[in-house]
Amino acid sequence: MHRRAFASSATLGLGATALPLAGPVAAQGGTAPRPTTLGGAITDVPGIRVGHFTDTRRPTGCTVVLTEEGAVGGVDVRGAAPGTRETDLLDPSNLVEQVHAILLSGGSAFGLDAAAGVVRWLEERGFGFPAGPVRVPIVPAAILFDLGVGNPAIRPNAASGYQACEAASAGPPVEGSVGAGAGATVGKLFGMARAMKGGIGTASVRVGRVTVGAIVAVNAVGDVIDPASGLVVAGTRTVDGRRGPGAAAAILQGDLPPALQPGMATTIGVVATDAVLTKAQARKLAQMAHDGLARTIEPVHTLWDGDTMFTVGTGRSGLPGNMMVMGVLAARVTASAVLRAVLAAKGLSGPELPSVPAASEIG
């Protein structure tokens, strides 16, 4: 069977079926079919709540994935310019087993301050790792670079993280230009003048009694590609502003990009499951989730990206995870979340902002 036909098959093994895929429809403003993606959201995983804070002063914000009661955490960092917090603690050889939230934030390294607000929110409610007379909330975090969009002095802080927690819900989170995806852009190998809008997206799939979901803030230096067709969904535009064949195609034709500053991009996300995981399994699942980034972003894991994927396992199903199956699902939901992020995004325009169209706005 052809690889793509197999990938879109409803049957994924273990006698169970995946959630149906959305059918292709005509893309707004163009003739290419809309990419096929999984439905659902990371909040379909029991024990997961998500909240966004979106700054109204410029496009930036943060997104919190709450696991207040504790979840086994893992992480895998593949980009060369990451900005992270508490990732060493997720090493399987280290002590603490569970995390209480994961924060994704804009604002580059400044945005890591938002994690302090998440910690305060959790502490006020008595959640955290028991350490003598106190409970210490464990909140790993990762950031993306959006300081080139509007006033760079405006970035997420502790109050932003706290507000994201206050907004958290078990319902489907809003996608597109919100939270950590508010200032995200993609297709920047040839500069912001030819870029398109990124965003944040989510998806999930259930096999048997186990659910796997993802949420991804897409701010890649590379292009977002539909893996089924190989076409650019959102990415480097032509010099005259049209949807182009992509940065990789341009490079192959000898059109080399200018020098870029490391850390100018970064895609970050979380994969969640209700399966029972060990820390080693959680880390492996985060590694396999990066396959979803590699299928939908080209190039990915570059010197200019700090691509980071977290995993949280709530264990609510009470079932051990089949790592082969869950790795397949983690890559699939991650890929779908990437596509949904740019499909739901809204373009940038206005005073002090670059003009950056979204996928829905150009042919």
Regions from the PLM with identified roles:
Residues 17-19:
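Solvent-exposed, non-transmembrane regulatory segments of membrane-associated proteins
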Residues 32-109, 113, 124-363:
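A structural signal for small-residue-enriched, beta-sheet-centric alpha/beta enzyme cores
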Residues 119-122:
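Active-site-surrounding "flap" and adjacent substrate/cofactor-binding loops of secreted or lumenal enzymes
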